[in-house]
Swiss-Prot record:
PROSITE patterns assigned: CRISP_1, CRISP_2
Keyword Secreted: yes
Main location: secreted
Record organism: Solenopsis richteri (Black imported fire ant)
Protein name from the UniProt record: Venom allergen 3
Ranges for domain SCP: 47-195
Disulfide bonds: 4-19, 9-103, 30-96, 176-193
Subcellular location: Secreted
Alphabetized UniProt keyword annotations: Allergen, Disulfide bond, Secreted
Region (Disordered), start-end ranges: 58-77
CC terms in the record's Gene Ontology section: extracellular region
Length: 211
């Protein structure tokens, strides 16, 4: 893929991460970096954690929410690891900038993103599972009336958007990147996960509720 020519980025006048950052080496913001990327076991752990959480919701076992428990889903297929999404996520993680990148789409589909960072004055012991749970636990602020149509209120997206991307039924693929680095004497652990097809489509159904 020529990422610099991707129409889905151009439509938004956005530069693709792989076009903007051509070097696979961590960028100038990444001081004393380590733990770039994942072992195969860690990749499996990320996928398995996501699928465990998807199945928790799909089977009606998530009791939290502002308006009562989360209803079960007709279907919420398991996610599988996607190397292309992972390469793009890692390239962005390697910039050590805690924000969303401008464009991370692929030829196949639009791509969504969750990011998390933890800081520690000593050794950073936060696990990948801990960070995924930071996203998922937004379910406590999620109103189950939003399932049939994702709200277009940006404020809502800010508070529950990580959770909704995790349980978005039409998302099939995940690929993540990670780096640890130092920033102002803090030991940072930065995780970027890219999801395709992207979730959090305004007005779209998050998942079909099982009656």
């Amino acid at each position: 893929t020529n990422y610099c020519n991707l129409q889905s980025c151009k439509r938004n006048n956005a530069i693709h991460t792989m076009c903007q950052y051509t070097s696979p080496t961590p960028g100038p913001m990444c001081l004393e970096y380590s733990n770039v990327g994942f072992t195969d076991a860690e990749k499996d752990a990320i996928v398995n954690k996501h699928n465990e959480l998807r199945q928790r919701v799909a089977s009606g076992k998530e009791m939290r929410g502002t308006n009562g428990p989360q209803p079960p889903a007709v279907k919420m297929p398991n996610l599988t690891w996607d190397p292309e999404l992972a390469t793009i996520a890692q390239r962005w993680a390697n910039q050590c900038t805690f924000e969303h990148d401008a464009c991370r789409n692929v030829e196949r589909f639009a791509v969504g993103q969750n990011i998390a960072a933890t800081s520690s004055s000593g050794k950073n012991k936060s696990t990948l599972s801990d960070m995924i749970l930071l996203w998922y636990n937004e379910v406590k602020d999620f109103d189950n009336r939003w399932i049939s149509s994702f709200p277009s209120d940006g404020n809502i997206l800010m508070h529950v958007g990580h959770y909704t991307q995790i349980v978005w039924a039409k998302t099939k693929k995940i690929g993540c990147g990670r780096i640890m680095f130092k920033e102002d004497n803090w030991n940072k652990h930065y995780l970027v996960c890219n999801y395709g097809p992207a979730g959090n489509v305004l007005g779209a159904q998050i998942y079909e509720i099982k009656k």
